[in-house]
């Protein structure tokens, strides 16, 4: 969420920045709420001071032998008025907070304006798409030819947008995740972390999935039910538990950056995506991903975004998969991001680039919700950290890219050299 001081003191400037994202800030509502808050705050403080003063008078009057009943009645009346004023202030502050939670992050000045992905800016390309002298097959046909992708079995077990992987395809899927983890931990300085796949509502609130995006999650209980200790949701990404590890913590600045990576399944309801990418592994309810998260000092976050994106790029480069780097426009960024790069890998069967990684600087948007702070040795007051996250990479989509880019005329798949140590030295599968 945004800094409340910005909404109080720089409202017009905030409105201009949010308008770039297509978000219309209700200035009249916010100004009226703030004026009402000030009035109630003064009223509450005045009543509190007056009641305290009258309460002290009771003891003095009693010592003088005076009748204290009128004072008691007055104190009780002031207490009732104070309770009413406090309740009104609490209600108003809850309304202010609810509205603030729906406000997206402010876009960085470098982010291009735009409405959707057609307005994203291509920053760079790496690698050249291969040329084939045979009819290119897509990953579904290749996987089924190898006996490794079974969508019919998944439909029987669960439903659509799931898959059963078998044999060498399943092995390659596992090899990819192990390769990614080894790269990030051994060369990029991340600490491998194992996290729960079920998280509570406080955790989902911390990274911004709740309250706005609850319909995109799989819940153990209906979201409408009152939250308790048994209300969980399956994680949509390891970003959620990894980032929340610093919730309500004050970190020593000398310990930053904190770099974490995790390989987890991810679960998404894909609300609103009906009819999109219905064939294959591109859009699934359950998919694996290796996630990278960094917790950094505020002044380091923009440099860190470039570094983190580079770590995701390195995976694609070592796999020799052509890709392009896109700077997302204001209309295509996630609500909590101030700047996002997408990496899009070349898929021969689709003759286009498709997203395989998204790397974002969340600024202090998540940290404020989580109250995640850091403190230096020279400053007594802690300050909010900045949080960043990125896919390093989506394992299923990487498998898609390997199957399609490394296919042979006879339907076999050449195993990328960097994966061969993870696959017993195999050079081809299928």
From Swiss-Prot:
The keyword Aminoacyl-tRNA synthetase applies. GO terms for biological process: selenocysteine biosynthetic process; seryl-tRNA aminoacylation. GO terms for molecular function: ATP binding; serine-tRNA ligase activity. It comes from the Bacteria. Pfam families: Seryl_tRNA_N, tRNA-synt_2b. One of its GO terms (cellular component) is cytoplasm. Consists of two distinct domains, a catalytic core and a N-terminal extension that is involved in tRNA binding. This is Serine--tRNA ligase.
